[in-house]
A protein has these predicted regions:
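Catalytic cores and adjacent flexible loops of soluble metabolic enzymes
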Residues: 2-302
């Protein structure tokens, strides 16, 4: 399979629920809740409400089968947290069960916002599939997991693949495994928080040209401007972590946006979309009175 040239997906876009995601479509904004719910279903609902109020198109969670993703040795390591004294206590404490996701599903439906998850193992894909999500996310950490890629693709749902900490050769291979149909790639840098000099936003148009599929941006920086710049450079969707308070306990809060920040990102992206235009230079009707008032004409000197 050639990696170059436009595909049907890049021309038509990728359908996620009731939204078409791709070039010439409004940027699809994903609020990454991830594990910022801190294991509290009520906090998860508050974050969903924040995303709705900001105007986001979707919220995303993370799902892991802990004993599959982590070794017994890793889980036994000492680590203090509100859930206990080991790394395993922490990991298990941050996972929601089936009944929690039933609440999440019902709350998102009532709030009229899409939800899906990045699944870190095949059992988690099967678990989330019970809720019939509109798509799946594959995290940068899983880009080289061919079994997970194939299992996720087998659901028949669109796949959003993050490409942080990955070489072009590794991305090439992942695209070969997944196929280009109903695939969206996200440019990303996997440091938390990411430095601006690590963001390399010019990779977005390069990836669009190389792979011929819609390309978006997953940001882990602390500011807002670079996410808006990603949209200007052609990102078909953007993803940012959200939190109620960046000072909260937890590993991802510091690289997340608080409610006001998320609202500003969505607002600014929509304003930029209005501002881009079609590239045809024209004189607008509202400029006509200004022409009459200020336009200077060449007056010959006798």
């Amino acid at each position: 399979m050639s990696l170059n040239g436009a595909t049907n997906s890049s021309r038509r876009g990728v359908q996620i629920g009731n939204r078409l995601v791709g070039d010439s479509e409004p940027c699809y904004v994903i609020a990454e809740i991830g594990i910022n719910h801190n294991g509290d279903i009520d906090q998860a609902k508050r974050l969903i409400s924040v995303a709705v109020a900001a105007g986001c198109d979707a919220v995303k969670f993370q799902k892991r089968t802990i004993d599959v993703v982590y070794s017994a040795e890793e889980l036994a390591k000492p680590r203090e947290s509100p859930f206990g004294t080991t790394n395993g206590d922490l990991k298990h404490g941050l996972e929601f069960d089936y009944y929690d996701y039933q609440e999440i599903d019902a709350y998102c439906r009532a709030s009229k916002i899409a939800w899906f998850a990045s699944c870190w193992d095949e059992m988690s894909v099967d678990f989330i599939e019970r809720f019939n999500p509109p798509c799946y996310k594959v995290a940068s950490a899983s880009l080289t997991d061919d079994h997970l890629l194939r299992h996720t693709r087998a659901t028949g749902k669109p796949v959003i693949l993050s490409t942080g900490m990955s070489t072009l050769d590794q991305i090439d291979h992942a695209v070969e495994v997944l196929g280009k149909e109903n695939l969206i790639l996200l440019h990303a840098c996997s440091t938390y928080p990411a430095y601006y000099e690590e963001l390399n936003l010019r990779a977005i148009p390069v990836m669009k040209s190389r792979y011929g599929v819609p390309v978006g941006y997953s940001g882990h920086e602390t500011g807002l401007a670079s996410t808006v710049a990603a949209a200007v450079l052609g990102a078909c969707c953007v993803e940012r972590h959200i939190t109620l308070d960046r000072s909260m306990w937890g590993s991802d809060h510091a690289a997340s946006l608080e409610p006001n920040g998320m609202s500003r990102v969505v607002r600014d992206i929509r304003l930029v979309e209005q501002s881009m235009g079609d590239g045809v230079k024209r004189v607008y009707e509202r400029e006509q009175p200004i022409i009459k008032k200020l336009r200077r004409v060449d007056i010959a000197v006798k």
